[in-house]
């Protein structure tokens, strides 16, 4: 199933697939080994830390990419039934904390999981735009995809 998924994504994207995020963060204890065996280099299913971490597998190292269920519009709005501004407040609070910590501890990574059918609708999109604007206004803030974060981390730790 993993290889079939990777092949379908590669065909659609037109480039090699190096990252993985399972639906609903679901996996088994064998999944990291299977992902590494299939050529996946990072996985966002492990909700740990604010920097990538290295996980040893039977087929080499697999990076775990920072991901947060606390900054995910599905639990916030669809399960906990909060209004859209809750995602804004949580995003800004987490960003401000990580930004302050980065001044003395070095770079931080913050994942923000939003879905077009939830946060992208007209009555919610303004709150997302406001959060993104807050972050973009701070010097040194970068908006990267997982592949870019992986490349940066591997260079920084080489």
Regions inferred by a protein language model and the residue ranges of each:
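A structural signal for the main folded, soluble domain(s) of proteins
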Residues: 2-4, 8, 12, 109-112, ...
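Active-site-adjacent pocket scaffolds in enzyme catalytic domains
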Residues: 7-11, 15-106
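Alpha-helix N-cap and loop-to-helix initiation/capping positions
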Residues: 1, 82-86, 123, 127
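C-terminal domain-boundary segment and adjacent tail
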Residues: 42, 92-158
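Detector for methionine-enriched segments
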Residues: 1, 55, 65, 77-78, ...
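Short, acidic/polar
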Residues: 1-2, 95
């Amino acid at each position: 199933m993993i290889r079939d998924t990777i092949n379908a994504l590669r065909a659609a994207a037109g480039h090699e697939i190096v990252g993985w995020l399972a639906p609903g963060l679901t996996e088994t204890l064998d999944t990291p080994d299977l992902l590494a065996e299939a050529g996946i280099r990072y996985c966002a299913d492990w909700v740990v830390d604010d920097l990538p971490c290295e996980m040893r597998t039977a087929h080499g190292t697999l990076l775990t990419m920072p991901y947060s269920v606390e900054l995910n519009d599905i639990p916030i709005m669809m399960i906990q039934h909060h209004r859209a501004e809750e995602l804004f407040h949580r995003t800004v609070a987490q960003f401000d904390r990580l930004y302050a910590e980065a001044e003395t501890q070095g770079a931080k990574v913050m994942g923000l999981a939003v879905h077009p059918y939830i946060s992208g609708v007209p009555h919610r999109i303004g709150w997302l735009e406001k959060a993104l604007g807050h972050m973009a206004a701070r010097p040194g803030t970068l908006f990267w995809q997982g592949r870019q974060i992986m490349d940066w981390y591997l260079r920084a730790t080489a």
